[in-house]
Design a protein with these regions (language model features):
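HIT superfamily nucleotide-processing domains
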Residues: 1-151
Length: 151
């Protein structure tokens, strides 16, 4: 099921043609993408592959994979980025982004205090010159994909 005017559904409809940054890893129920508009390399988004707008809409099969994906991504981010920990956050409230998605954000040891905790969202919607480039996001995606075993 897809929804018109949904960015995530539009990307899913183009799945086979997506660049590495838009399909870091995936399975039948979930797709992992590198976040767009961020200045933080490795900021990932875990997306259900069908359109839902609330966590309670997950099927049991989707829910069963959710925790495993969050842990696997956190481990892979630690290996690839050297982060001390990861944040996992879900809102799905922004205009055009009501499709449920989980931010899996690497938190480096030297991240300034103003960007820790919920302040990390200050690293999204950055000016173009501050954003992780598509090429860099693709490189990170490939490294994470290799760490995850192509899952």
């Amino acid at each position: 099921m897809t929804a018109p005017d949904c960015y995530t559904c539009a990307m899913e409809a183009e799945f086979d043609a997506l660049p590495p940054r838009e399909r870091v890893a995936y399975d039948r129920y979930w797709r992992v993408a590198h976040a767009t508009g961020t200045s933080l390399p490795g900021w990932l988004v875990l997306l259900p592959r069908r359109h839902i707008t609330a966590v309670h809409e997950l099927t049991d099969a989707e829910a069963a994979g959710l925790g495993a994906w969050q842990v696997r991504l956190s481990r892979a981010l630690r290996t690839v980025t050297g982060c001390e920990k990861t944040y996992v956050v879900q809102f799905a409230e922004a205009e055009g982004f009501a499709h449920v998605h989980f931010h899996v954000v690497p938190r480096a040891g030297d991240l300034p205090s103003e960007y820790r905790g919920p302040g990390v969202f200050g690293l999204l919607r950055r000016p173009a010159e501050q954003q992780v480039t598509e090429g860099r996001a693709d490189d990170i995606a490939r490294a994470l994909g290799a760490e995850l075993g192509g899952a």
